[in-house]
């Protein structure tokens, strides 16, 4: 897994992708920090939480080539026939993308140190927000990686990941567009109304953005961590199964 991780991590910086991604993140974080600090707020966790605004665009760039590029260049045949576990390949690629994503948050540590010189900071609020950002990134990377394993076109993988990111992050907003029947009469109408209400409530509670925003409340909830971690495990597993299917095809 270590060899795959190093190979993938270096590949991000052998092309402009890694540099452009970090430049965009650094610029956005710096801009947010200047605004928040300008208003006299010492809360760096707010800067971290603001990352959700661009994460839907950053992740597709990081994941669109993870699997599809190897498949297009036929490099995957070497990996699939080599004496190496498929799980090591997948985990190596996943952690490489996550490492590049995590590098983007290094400036927030500097921001936290700067603010600490002037005012008392809430380090726990910052750590909670950072944990949420890492978990959200891990979730979206795992989804993007799985999509990338299904096609040899980086463009298709990137576009699909972007669309799914928008849908999963903002399901709660979409749920508000669903008209919930009220004042229904009759058994079928009542049952249908209950189904719609339950579905809307489900979308609202499971939307990634809804869960992520809870990390900004300065309250640690193990259920939110487990929820995000479970999704990561699920899509990493699906990526492994996708590659294993091609190995034995």
Predicted regions and their residues:
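Hydrophobic alpha-helical transmembrane segments
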Residues: 1-69, 110, 218-249
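Secretory targeting signals
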Residues: 32-37, 41-54, 96-161, 169, ...
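Membrane-interfacial segments
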Residues: 37, 68-71, 75, 115-119, ...
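Terminal transmembrane helical anchor/hairpin motif
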Residues: 45, 158, 164-242
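A hydrophobic, multi-pass inner-membrane permease signature
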Residues: 59, 74-75, 93, 106, ...
